[in-house]
Amino acid sequence: MLPAKFKTPSQKSLNRRMASIPDGLVRRCPVCHTTFLTDHWEPTRLCPACGYGFRLTAMQRIKLTMDTFQETNAQLTVPDRYTDAAYQAKVARGRQLTGLNESVLTGFGTIDHQSTAIGVMDAFFVMGSLGTATGEKITRLFDEATAKRLPVILFTASGGARMQEGIHSLMQMAKVSAAVARHSQAGLLYIVVLCDPTTGGVTASFAMQGDLILAEPHALVGFAGRRVIEQTIHQTPPADFQRAETVLQHGFIDAIVARPQLKQRLADLLRLHKGES
């Protein structure tokens, strides 16, 4: 019998090796299913094969987009009347992950010397859901932008209305829509950027009310979830169902812009609206 050249490692040795591998070193794209190393993917966090943009926190998005930024209404958070322990745990987890008090970051700043109001919904905070304070922050953003005669850019990323807050959450759809209307009646520009995912009550209201509606490549955009639709119509939708490319083909959005080009495209659109070349 030949002597063994290789020795089977012990479980203890394997555990030590696993512990030395950093978290997030390898990712798998949910769109094209490519597996890749993440050593060079910051700050844009794109799939190298298909260009799908992995989810960003609101602050990461601000750093990619804005040259200057001043946050507003940072203190607004979930009202005290919602005392459910499981819900409070989700909110606490969202605060830990994002550093925010709610699922949207709002403020004012500049993009390539163009002044604008900006809001960024954060999918890492209770799935970017539309809660009472979320709606209040976005409403204040639009009203403050109207008073200052500034455009609004809103990045949407949301699972929809926050069911834990019931009718108060649903009311935010109408409340924000009214603020959008006041801003529009003042002749001001509203640009929406649909990020992955934009669904539910957010899609059914202010996400589709922009003067210009952009989307990131392969972003999930829809109202009801795929599983709910399959159970309702008893059919299997196509693989690209509710992806930004399909939504563009059906005329619901104006353009798909890759993440590396998005900042310059927004700056160009702001200039065009001001009548600058």
Curated annotation (Swiss-Prot):
Signal peptide range: none
GO terms, molecular function: acetyl-CoA carboxylase activity; ATP binding; carboxyl- or carbamoyltransferase activity; zinc ion binding
Any one Pfam family match given in the protein's UniProt record, by short name: Carboxyl_trans
Zinc finger region(s), C4-type: 29-50
Cofactor binding note from Swiss-Prot or TrEMBL: Binds 1 zinc ion per subunit.
Residues bound to Zn(2+): C29, C32, C47, C50
Protein name: Acetyl-coenzyme A carboxylase carboxyl transferase subunit beta
Species of provenance: Levilactobacillus brevis (strain ATCC 367 / BCRC 12310 / CIP 105137 / JCM 1170 / LMG 11437 / NCIMB 947 / NCTC 947) (Lactobacillus brevis)
Protein encoded by which gene: accD
